[in-house]
UniProtKB/Swiss-Prot annotation:
The keyword Magnesium is annotated on this UniProt entry: no
Enzyme's top EC category: transferase
Residues annotated as binding substrate: K148, D180, T217, K218, F219, E220
Protein name per UniProt: tRNA (guanine-N(7)-)-methyltransferase
Organism of derivation: Escherichia coli O6:H1 (strain CFT073 / ATCC 700928 / UPEC)
Amino acid sequence: MKNDVISPEFDENGRPLRRIRSFVRRQGRLTKGQEHALENYWPVMGVEFSEDMLDFPALFGREAPVTLEIGFGMGASLVAMAKDRPEQDFLGIEVHSPGVGACLSSAHEEGLSNLRVMCHDAVEVLHKMIPDNSLRMVQLFFPDPWHKARHNKRRIVQVPFAELVKSKLQLGGIFHMATDWEPYAEHMLEVMSSIDGYKNLSESNDYVPRPASRPVTKFEQRGHRLGHGVWDLMFERVK
């Protein structure tokens, strides 16, 4: 499952342009279970888009570190992380409603109270709803690599986007990316290394081993069986 959730084009003031998206809305058919989850669990765990900044302590009912995941696919790894780290809070963004329904269903099954989800364009959410200096971590796992050269501008990891993420991270917060497409990994590394205020957490100044905190997805397991590599990058906001 590829996640592909945001439109990375910005104007000169850093505001998102709406002309080019890095995702295509492929809503697909909802299963009965996904439809049931959207109808019954969205009122509890769903967050509607608005132009008001989120108050995380009010949203989750407590003070706790917040992780934002952009493009959670069907939500399996996001639910696993929220289950494994009950002391932290998680907000996931995904534009495809079947994935949102699947995530809500799994989260309900696990009885999670530390997970909220949104179904909206992530750049708009970052600009309009995420307070500056509020996130402990931002996760972007397996975004669409847009293989063809003429589509490279659609890749979400571009300098303006990485700068936007940095502004939302707390000092010491982490931007964690993963991809199975080596040219995209190289692109991510080039973009992130060019930005003042980020520190690469790799000892070799490139990629990090997969941290135990990131579950291995079915998509990734299949890739390993086929001999595909996976590259993790972790950058800390240091100023």
